[in-house]
Amino acid sequence: VSERNDHSSNTVNSASQPATEQQEQVRAGNNSSPATTIAIVGGAGDLAKKLLLPGIAEYAAMSGTNVRIIGADMADDVDYPAYFAAALEASGTPTETLSSLIAQSTYFQVDATSAADLQKLMDVATEQQVAGPILYFALPPMITARALKALEGVKLPDGVVLALEKPIGESLETARAVNEQLAKLVGEEQIFRVDHFLGLSGTVNIEGLRASNMLIDPIWNAQHIDEVRIVFNETIGLEDRAAFYDKTGAAVDMIQSHLIQVMSHVLADEDTSPSEILRMSKAVEARRGRYTAGTVGGKELPSYVDEPGVEPSRNTETWARIQLAVDTDRWRGIPIILESGKGIGHPRREISAVFRQTQDGAPANVLRLSFESDELGIEVNANDPSDPDASEWNARITLSSGLVPSKLGAYGRVARSLLTGEKHLRLTAAAAEEGWRIIEPVLESYDSLPLEEYEAGTTPGQ
């Protein structure tokens, strides 16, 4: 049974809504409202090009917000308007918004670890600036840490916002050091620790479904649920990321950086915050694996150890699964499974809850929320209508529905939070540290934990 509700009564057709004054100004190419400056350190890198710049453009197009972008990086000659245009080429950004953003974009060569360079960048960022600019570090964690140290020698303008990508640090100790350094520079309300997974559809939707539906909220607990599983598997291999990934692995790259934080929001409620969920969580089991040569989606993928830039002796895992125990009244006693891997055949990217079986032994009901496709599915048992004499279940049915389509992607939501001061997607200092506290015992266990092998294109851990 499949039902898609694309015409829900609370679906907003943006085309039929009157444009805001700012949107009309953007369309006319003469938005005179004060621009908010976002200076992106690492602005010529992959993250900026593939995710952040398209996200900013997406939100600017929706809201009419006037944004000025300064790309800052080590390269000495970057045509940033052309770079920006290339980044947005496939994004579907309206021409008017694209023209406005490109016209206001500039490039600044900077060594992120130089106080003198960062001071010059701040001077440029505060030109014609009413509110404090946003200084966004789209850099590897330890370069960000060095940049924050360099900011001690920079006169930061009032209201400046410091935004930094996860992971925060490379360990619990270094995460604490980064948080201590941030606290020396600005107040907590001026710090934005970015985890775009909190802006993915699945994470956003599960919170609303639980809190707003009597069908779900009363049974969203260990009394009625047997297992919660959060999975983000990928078909891709390294994709030229060996320099980063081979020193990191699946457990840190995905589970520590993202899925642990998603878990805290999935399990939180009005009485227990995500931070409290994290404090009450610990890892109790772990598995890991590494892909060998195989075929994924018709594409040959070499063995991980044969990928350029990989050092086989590191024994880096490309797939990790951990089981958590969460010691709260609502969740005590059931497994919380977090899993992520690369080179996976038929990958799942979802949040799922497996409910307890009924007394008649029928298969358990399962609720599934896709991370990316705005879809909800519920697996239930029913009678087969072709067998009217059946007195018990004899058919398995999946009820599925498209949710209200998202107006913004994950980085569009990040941009909205940055530009409006919304706090939902901001990680606290404690949350960033708790992620490391939870994962470090897992990493320590790897010395004695077998490194399983799975053929690329298959599903490990079966």
Locations of regions flagged by a protein language model:
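Secretory/organelle targeting and membrane-embedding segments
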Residues: S2-A163, I168-Q462
